[in-house]
């Protein structure tokens, strides 16, 4: 029996073929999401570090002004 699979119509696929297709899609999606997520996280951390440095600088200046009074 020679089967031709139409990948747009999942009803013609065997359960094993469906499982393999879903697993491959899930894995590649996770990889893609992981890479994008990491880049986004790095950008957010960079912004956070910049804001933190500015805040600490302002806090230090406030303390110095209070000490001078």
Swiss-Prot record:
Coiled-coil regions listed: 35-69
Keywords from the named record: Coiled coil
Region annotation Disordered: where it falls in the sequence: 21-42
Annotated protein name in UniProt: Uncharacterized protein 346R
